[in-house]
Amino acid sequence: MQATNQTFQKMYNRALVLRHVRRNERISRVDLSRALGLKKSSISNIVAELLEAGIISEREQGESSASGGRKPIFLEVNRQFCGFLGIEVQPNRYNAVFLDLAGRVLFQREGKVSTYRDGFEPSLEKIYEELAPLAEQTGLPVAGICLGVPGYVHPADGTILYSIPHGLENWRVSPRAQPWDVPVYVENDANCCAWGELMVHPNSGAVDFLSVLMEFQEENPRLQQDIGISTGFGVVINGSLYYGQAFNSGEFKSALWTRNNKSQVGIPDEQLLGIRENQDILDDYLTELLMNLSPIVSVMSPQRVVLCGDGRNLLPRISYLLESRLSDRFIGLAAQRGLFQPSIHAQHNVAIGAAGRLLETLFDQPRIGRSRYEMGVDWEYVLDRFSVPGSELV
C-alpha cells in the first residue's frame, strides 16, 4: 500500500507541475516551488524528468533578483510533443480541428458526409482518410481523438446511447477505423461547446456557466422533423461539466412542449419548418427558449451564458428580444449585466471542444479511483507512447 501511495503522490505532483506550467507561460522552478508548496528538490527532480521526456522545455532566462544570483530559466509545455483531434460529426457534414499541447489550432477542415446514406462508421473512415495527410503535415503525433455528436452519449465508455440524427442506439465507437491506433472518445456536441469554453479560460477556477448550442437543421430522412432548429445545453458547475445520472443533462424540452410535438418546444411543428425564413417564427422560438432559461438562470446564477453554433449569430436578435418583449422578466433583467456572450470559436465550437476535452482531462489532476482512460488519455499513456526514447519517466 505504501508503494502505491508513493506512486500516486508522484503522479499527482507531476500533474500539478504540468498543469501549472501550462497555465503560466513564464514560470521558473523557484516560482513552481512557491506556488505549489513543494520542496525545491522535488521540483528539480520532476522538472528534470519532464525535460528528459521532452514534454516541457526551457525558454529564455529572466532577470536576476535585486540580491543577484542566477537568472531564472523559464519553463513551458513542449507544444510539439503531441496533438489531439476533435471532430464534429453531423449527418451531412463534419468539422475537424487539430490542437497541439498548448491548445493552438494547427489545422481546421470542413467536409461533406452522409451518415444516413453511407452509415456512421464508413463516414468516419472517410473523415479519417481526409484528415490523415493534414495531421502528418503538422509533424505532431496524434495522441487521441474525440467525436462530438448530437444525441445521448456515455462520455466515459465511448457509447452513443441514442442519436436520432445518426440513427444510432447503444453504438460503441471503435478505434479500428482510424490509422493512428489511438484511443477514440465520444461526447455530446453541446457538451463539447462547454469543454471549449473551459479550455479558453483555464485560469478561471470554479466557474458556473451554460453553453447553448443552437443549430438550424439540414434535411435528414432520419429526423423526426424534416427541417427546423435544435438546441442543447452544456452545464458547468464549479469548473466541471455536469452530466447527470443518465448522461442526459442539458437535453432541452420546453415547459410548453407536449408529447405530440416532434420538436423541443410548444410551437407547432409545421410552423417551425419556416423558422429560417420567417422572423416572427424565429422570434417566437427564441422567446420561448429565453422564458425557459429564466428559472434556470435564477436558480443556478451562472456567470455567463455562452451562445454557440448558429446561436452565436443570433445574439443581436436575442438581445433585442430581451430588451423589448422580455424587458420586465427576470431573464431580461439578468441580461443587463452581460449574461449572454458569443463563443469565440465561431463555427468550430464543437470540434475545438471535442479536442479540448482531451486536453483538459490530460492536464487535470489524477484522482484515486479514476479508471485508466476514463474521460481521456492520461499522462501514463502519453509518456509511455511519445516520450523521448531512453527517458526513464514512468
Briefly describe each language-model feature range.
Residues 108, 119-120, 174, 182-284, ...:
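Glycine/GP-enriched mid-protein hinge/lid loop-to-helix segment characteristic of carbohydrate kinases
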